[in-house]
């Protein structure tokens, strides 16, 4: 059932991105809103992009409650760890995670998947859930497909946001 929903949403995102001439910012904002509005476990969805010189991640689009964490140093929190590891990171229970930056007291779990452009980690998608342990390998594969679609759609323009 989850996979069927993911396939439908991925098709909607692919169609929207290919048929509209949105800016990168508008496109990734639309993706954030689409995921948050269509997947009950995705209470907060955001895209962070890397600034290699300062070794920081910068929040460029999100859907959900506002956050104070708009700039995250590499290595700090789940997002910062993914900036260094280049690998997806699923946290079933954030209360058990040592290197965790709390965005909201309501967050129970998190998944972060890197966004690659020409095999370089340029950013990531970050999902927070108020449910414990809702993310699995299907979520990881789905979010990897979304990141690839965004990289394929916008290419080097992603480096300019």
Question: What feature does the model see in each segment?
Answer:
Residues 1-62, 66, 156-161:
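Intrinsically disordered, low-complexity terminal regulatory regions
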Residues 10, 14, 129-161:
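Juxtadomain coupling helices with adjacent low-complexity linkers
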Residues 44, 112, 124:
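Short hydrophobic/aromatic beta-strand element in the GNAT-like acyltransferase core
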Residues 49-56, 60-102:
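Regulatory sensory and allosteric helical modules in signal-transduction proteins
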Residues 109-116:
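A short, aliphatic-rich beta-strand micro-motif
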Residues 116-129:
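Sensory-domain boundary capping and coupling elements
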